[in-house]
């Protein structure tokens, strides 16, 4: 219980929407708890520190999944000693120091891989609890901050990854990845499909085009899925691509088994009302799908965290990897044409999913902050921050 004024500083990043969504889920949950003595502030560290360079890096990151896969693969799978020498480890250092001086937080929460935090925890006794919410299913070195108080991870296998590299097991909690609470609430699937002019007795295949960053080939995929899966209907989410939505709507306007949508705020309802989803294995998207127990097909995952997430879900029986659209269509046909594999996948997900991750994490954060040092004990010593600038 927080009985005196405390402050949580959340450091996040806008490389993709997932980290921001996790941050918002935690902020919303803490706000819902109506804690008068707690303030929560969030900062997109890299964007605030170097807005122009970070914008360029973000564009490269997004395009790397399509055009620069080998380059990103080389970065992601680099040896730890190479990452330690990379400028990325010091990216945003001055901004981070200034944030700590200005905000004087009682706890720092990382929802984005922030290697620069390691510079502070390794070289200075900042005496502030540091916690990390990991948003993927396999460990990468950039998630590790030496001397952290807590890591919140998705699964027991992720925890073992941390233990294998020497992290104290007592600092790693298996909580699941935090997502919006709406993905935990019941949905009337039949009524949702009826309201959207779809047949609740057919198997609904959900496709998220926005996840792929491309706009070609979906018309053929939809046609082939319907041809090879007799009792299927397809919902295509085109995201912000108006051109794709326009072309697909024109092609399938007379087909009652196809619904073409643009950007939607109802992915929760569509996941809850579908039997299978074709998507990219981003950490938050697949966690939302996991919560809704919808088996997934991962189309041509990019090397790095995408591929590692996909391999984990395939290993656990929650999804399947397809290297090509043709392979994805075959998997859809196999799963929807009467065998028990799809039912078994759903059952496995029901058994293994971790509920209410956001609430669990927020309760633990409050426990950590309740045991943290008093502000004057941390910030009353001027030499602490003076050392940052004379190092």
Curated annotation (Swiss-Prot):
Its EC number is 2.4.1.315. Keywords: Carbohydrate metabolism, Cell membrane, Glycosyltransferase, Lipid biosynthesis, Lipid metabolism, Membrane, Transferase. Gene3D superfamilies: Glycogen Phosphorylase B. GO terms for biological process: enterobacterial common antigen biosynthetic process; glycolipid biosynthetic process; lipoteichoic acid biosynthetic process. It is found in: Cell membrane. Optimum pH is 7.5. Pfam families: Glyco_tran_28_C, MGDG_synth. GO terms for cellular component: plasma membrane. Disruption phenotype: Cells lacking this gene are defective in beta-diglucosyl-DAG and are smaller than wild-type. Diacylglycerol (DAG) is the anchor of the LTA in the mutant. GO terms for molecular function: 1,2-diacylglycerol 3-glucosyltransferase activity. Belongs to the glycosyltransferase 28 family. UgtP subfamily. Processive glucosyltransferase involved in the biosynthesis of both the bilayer- and non-bilayer-forming membrane glucolipids. Is able to successively transfer two glucosyl residues to diacylglycerol (DAG), thereby catalyzing the formation of beta-monoglucosyl-DAG (3-O-(beta-D-glucopyranosyl)-1,2-diacyl-sn-glycerol) and beta-diglucosyl-DAG (3-O-(beta-D-glucopyranosyl-beta-(1->6)-D-glucopyranosyl)-1,2-diacyl-sn-glycerol). Beta-diglucosyl-DAG is the predominant glycolipid found in Bacillales and is also used as a membrane anchor for lipoteichoic acid (LTA). This is Processive diacylglycerol beta-glucosyltransferase.
């Amino acid at each position: 219980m927080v009985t005196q004024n405390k402050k949580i500083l959340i450091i996040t990043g806008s490389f993709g929407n997932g980290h921001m969504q996790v941050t918002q889920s935690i902020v919303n949950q803490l706000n819902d708890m109506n804690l008068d003595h707690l303030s929560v502030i969030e900062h997109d560290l890299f964007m605030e520190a170097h807005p122009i360079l970070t914008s360029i890096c973000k564009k490269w990151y997004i395009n790397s999944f399509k055009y620069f896969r080998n380059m990103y693969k080389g970065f992601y799978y680099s040896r730890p000693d190479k990452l330690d020498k990379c400028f990325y480890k010091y990216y945003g250092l001055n901004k981070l120091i200034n944030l700590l001086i200005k905000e004087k937080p009682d706890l720092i929460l990382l929802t984005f891989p922030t290697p620069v935090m390691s510079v502070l925890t390794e070289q200075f006794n900042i005496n502030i609890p540091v916690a990390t919410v990991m948003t993927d299913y396999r460990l990468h070195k950039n998630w590790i901050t030496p001397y952290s108080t807590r890591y919140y991870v998705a699964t027991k296998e992720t925890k073992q990854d941390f233990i294998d590299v020497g992290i104290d097991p007592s600092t790693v909690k298996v909580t699941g990845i935090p997502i919006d609470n709406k993905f935990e609430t019941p949905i009337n699937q039949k009524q949702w499909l009826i309201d959207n002019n779809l047949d609740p007795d057919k198997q609904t295949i959900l496709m998220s085009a926005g996840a792929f960053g491309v706009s070609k080939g979906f018309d053929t995929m939809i046609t082939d899925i319907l041809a090879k899966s007799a009792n299927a209907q397809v919902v295509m989410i085109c995201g912000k691509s108006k051109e794709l939505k326009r072309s697909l709507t024109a092609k399938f306007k007379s087909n009652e088994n196809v619904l073409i949508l643009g950007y939607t705020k109802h992915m929760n309802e569509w996941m809850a009302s579908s039997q299978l989803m074709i998507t990219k294995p981003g950490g938050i998207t697949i966690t939302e799908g996991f919560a809704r127990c919808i088996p997934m097909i991962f189309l041509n995952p990019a090397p790095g965290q995408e591929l590692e997430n996909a391999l984990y879900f395939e290993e656990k029986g929650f999804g399947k990897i397809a290297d090509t659209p043709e392979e994805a269509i075959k998997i859809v046909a196999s799963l929807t044409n009467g065998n028990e594999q799809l039912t078994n996948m759903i059952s496995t997900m029901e058994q293994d999913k971790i509920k209410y991750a956001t609430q669990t994490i927020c309760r633990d954060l409050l426990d950590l902050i309740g045991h943290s040092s008093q502000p004057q004990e941390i910030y009353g010593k001027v030499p602490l921050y003076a050392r940052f600038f004379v190092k």
